């Protein structure tokens, strides 16, 4: 399993929501699929764009357990921006 960092812009009515997520997955495609399943409602939302990069815990210069805890905290509140269009 790899960890991927995704920035997802979702449009709903006149609002853009930006999600910043860390997803554990075997591939980029699996990470995107998980986002579709967990955060996206096809009936009322459209995806503007998705940026996916592979994330390495060593990029954070902390231990794996600390990185896992930080990632869990960040994923608990994934919507970081809402913008009226």
Regions found by a protein language model. Give the residues of each.
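Short aromatic-glycine-(Arg/Gly/Cys) micro-motifs in beta-strand/loop hairpins
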Residues: 1-18
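Intrinsically disordered, low-complexity boundary segments flanking structured domains
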Residues: 7-10, 35-41, 64
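A short, exposed loop/beta-hairpin motif centered on an aromatic-Gly-Thr core
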Residues: 16-28
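A short, charged, amphipathic alpha-helix used as a generic interaction element across diverse proteins
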Residues: 26-48
């Amino acid at each position: 399993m790899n960890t991927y960092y995704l920035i997802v812009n979702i449009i709903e009515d006149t609002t853009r929501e930006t999600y910043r997520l860390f997803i554990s997955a075997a591939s980029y495609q699996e990470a995107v699929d998980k986002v579709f399943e967990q955060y996206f409602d096809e009936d009322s939302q459209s995806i503007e764009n998705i940026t996916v990069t592979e994330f390495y815990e060593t990029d954070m210069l902390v231990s794996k357990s600390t990185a896992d805890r930080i990632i869990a905290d960040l994923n608990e509140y994934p919507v970081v921006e809402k913008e009226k269009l």
